[in-house]
Amino acid sequence: MRPLVLLWGCLVLPGYEALKGPKEISGFEGDTVSLRCTYVEKMKEHRKYWCRQGGILVSRCGDIVYANQDQEVTRGRMSIRDSPQELSMTVIMRDLTLKDSGKYWCGIDRLGRDESFEVTLIVFPGKRDNAVPAGTCCPSSPTPSFQPLTPTRSLQPKAKAWQTQLPEPRSSRPVVWLPLTTPQDSRAVASSVSKPSVSIPMVRMMAPVLILLSLLLAAGLIAFGSHMLRWRKKAWLATETQKNEKVYLETSLPGNGWTTEDSTIDLAVTPECLRNLNPSAVPSPETQNLSQSTEEEEAARSLDDDKEDVMAPPPLQMSAEELAFSEFISV
């Protein structure tokens, strides 16, 4: 958690007073304005630039003008000069137009995050009035005399106002009219004063968010990959187990000479009976076992009888004379 906080601070928080300058400058159409941005000693060797802020959602620089040490660069109506001895750079804008109004950046180019300072330019419509034309001389006039101000108070039904009447000055000096400040202008000036001296561009604010999103995405991909690997390993182990069980069953089957009790065939039955035997007339296994035991007993008895017949002595063979003599004796 601590490295993420440090990363956020490095990306978002700008350098402390590394670059200073005016927050706002103004002028009329056709005028020339200049401003001066100062920087610290360690920024002396870096390249300086002046650009206009652009973009809608993400701030970016446009119309950038770069300047190196002791170099003055002019592009169009803008010029920038870097003075490392004074630790400052000067920006001049000529022939102002209403389109020049907007926000600009006075920045220092360096590796990683740039140091920048936001400046607001306000261009008033119309040209500045010159009371004294060029090439003319004003006649000398006596010291003007002024009358003291006499405030007059006028009451209205629902409001009170103090009105001050200014006497006409008895002088031939030209009159310079200052631009009137409306409530909107006063609010704009107040808001510009209340703004901090250092502004954070949208890119710097979005960079930590993008980095965190990328880290979360990478962590999710790693977790998903590990889950898939475990699932594939389990599936492979299950397949191998099934194969091993199948091989064991095939090797443990009985041989050709092995017969079960249910598969015993009664040898005493003739082939004709087997051919004429209907499937419905096939005896049950218990009946087959009983008939088989009875037939085995009968076969054993017949074998005993055969043995006795073999062991009995053969009959005596007598000749014809002996037979006749025996017949004679018996009579």
Curated annotation (Swiss-Prot):
It is a single-pass type I membrane protein. This is CMRF35-like molecule 9. GO terms for biological process: immune system process; immunoglobulin transcytosis in epithelial cells. Expressed in monocyte cell lines. Expressed in certain types of endothelial and myeloid lineage cells. Expressed in mesenteric lymph nodes (LNs), spleen, thymus, lung, heart and kidney. Expressed in high endothelial venules (HEVs) in peripheral and mesenteric LNs (at protein level). Highly expressed in heart. Slightly expressed in spleen and thymus. Isoform 5 is expressed preferentially in heart. Isoform 1 is expressed predominantly in kidney and liver. Residues 19-120 form the Ig-like V-type domain. Residues 226-331 are cytoplasmic. Glycans are attached at T136, S140, T143, S145, T150, T152, S154, T164, T181, T182, S186. O-glycosylated with sialylated oligosaccharides. Receptor which may mediate L-selectin-dependent lymphocyte rollings. Binds SELL in a calcium dependent manner. Binds lymphocyte. SUPFAM superfamilies: Immunoglobulin (SSF48726). Gene3D superfamilies: Immunoglobulins. Residues 278-318 are annotated as: Disordered. The lineage of its organism: Eukaryota, Metazoa, Chordata, Craniata, Vertebrata. GO terms for cellular component: apical plasma membrane; basolateral plasma membrane; multivesicular body membrane. Its main location: membrane.
